[in-house]
Amino acid sequence: MADDAGAAGGPGGPGGPGLGGRGGFRGGFGSGLRGRGRGRGRGRGRGRGARGGKAEDKEWIPVTKLGRLVKDMKIKSLEEIYLFSLPIKESEIIDFFLGASLKDEVLKIMPVQKQTRAGQRTRFKAFVAIGDYNGHVGLGVKCSKEVATAIRGAIILAKLSIVPVRRGYWGNKIGKPHTVPCKVTGRCGSVLVRLIPAPRGTGIVSAPVPKKLLMMAGIDDCYTSARGCTATLGNFAKATFDAISKTYSYLTPDLWKETVFTKSPYQEFTDHLVKTHTRVSVQRTQAPAVATT
């Protein structure tokens, strides 16, 4: 399989250094001479309002205990879910809390092929980043026969993978947090991405792919360092997302104080879950008996 990223990232191609440094992908973002979002990614990434459909009009019927607690307003925020490390299995939970502020953007759509006896089977792989630009970011990857189906699936997976982003200060703690709290490193394949705190006003000094993820995470100032085969956009984005998700994986002196945990929502609202539980009956059809002579 020949990846189209190599063709787009050459010195003379649309992703070359002479055309704004698009980072080797055709349908994403950047400030090249050919405009914004040429190729397969054209017209996408404008937020939830640009991709309306019948799915949003349907009433959400939760199928998990967490979904029932969220819909019944027993859980007030996403942070309560993250505090107890409860797995989120329904994308509607994210829409319930962050729906109005969520923005998504297609990073890349690439064809992948599988050799079969009938020939080559081509499918499309979509990379989608999603975030609210205020401390929550997610990354989804989906492969499907059709581009639209791959994008929809990647958006759902990105919502399910949303993580909280911890932000901090470079020097004096004045104003709102604006950068990563300390140096963090993420890895995927051969790609290693390091995020380094930066002074206020520096901006995000990075390639286009990490820059988009950091912006969606709500980080305003950050230095980055990357090594490995960063032309592989999927690994580059996953390594950046891994680094961002590690901002809450270590303790700092302000977190040394003993934390008094309350009961898990499943324990606290056990009676409510029992009352609202509806048993789903599955009708099993028995195959007709075959008469033998």
Curated annotation (Swiss-Prot):
Localization per record: Cytoplasm; Nucleus, Nucleolus
Cross-link (Glycyl lysine isopeptide (Lys-Gly) (interchain with G-Cter in ubiquitin)): 54, 58, 275
Disordered: region residues: 1-55
Domain S5 DRBM: 102-165
The entry's keywords: Acetylation, Citrullination, Cytoplasm, Isopeptide bond, Nucleus, Phosphoprotein, Repeat, Ribonucleoprotein, Ribosomal protein, Ubl conjugation
Protein role: Component of the ribosome, a large ribonucleoprotein complex responsible for the synthesis of proteins in the cell. The small ribosomal subunit (SSU) binds messenger RNAs (mRNAs) and translates the encoded message by selecting cognate aminoacyl-transfer RNA (tRNA) molecules. The large subunit (LSU) contains the ribosomal catalytic site termed the peptidyl transferase center (PTC), which catalyzes the formation of peptide bonds, thereby polymerizing the amino acids delivered by tRNAs into a polypeptide chain.
Name this protein carries in UniProt: Small ribosomal subunit protein uS5
UniProt source species: Rattus norvegicus
High-level lineage: Eukaryota, Metazoa, Chordata, Craniata, Vertebrata
